[in-house]
């Protein structure tokens, strides 16, 4: 069983929190592990994006590279807390 690979790219799909939660639940259900791939200052290669299972855009804004992992982790925790009926997401 392979990881479900989510590539982060500015051209990816924009998701609100509820849609991210629904996608997250599907990703977890479809695979043992979910991997998030974050590119460097020049982004990810087109080949890697094409081979990923999903391409997600955090925003059309430009963020410092070091901030993106923090944003991704916070959003993962937020949607996970929603799946557990935890009040963090409010």
Question: What is each stretch, according to the model?
Answer:
Residues 39, 45:
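Rossmann-fold NAD(P)-binding glycine/threonine-rich loop
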Residues 28-37, 57-65:
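Short, acidic/small-residue loops that bind anionic groups at enzyme active sites
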């Amino acid at each position: 069983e392979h990881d479900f690979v989510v590539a982060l790219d500015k051209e990816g799909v924009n998701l609100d929190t509820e849609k991210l939660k629904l996608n997250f639940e599907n990703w977890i259900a479809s695979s043992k592990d979910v991997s998030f791939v974050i590119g460097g200052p020049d982004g990810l290669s087109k080949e890697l994006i094409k081979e990923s299972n999903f391409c997600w855009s955090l925003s059309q804004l430009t963020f410092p590279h070091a901030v993106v992992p923090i944003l991704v982790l916070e959003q993962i925790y937020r949607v996970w807390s929603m799946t557990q009926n935890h009040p963090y997401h409010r």
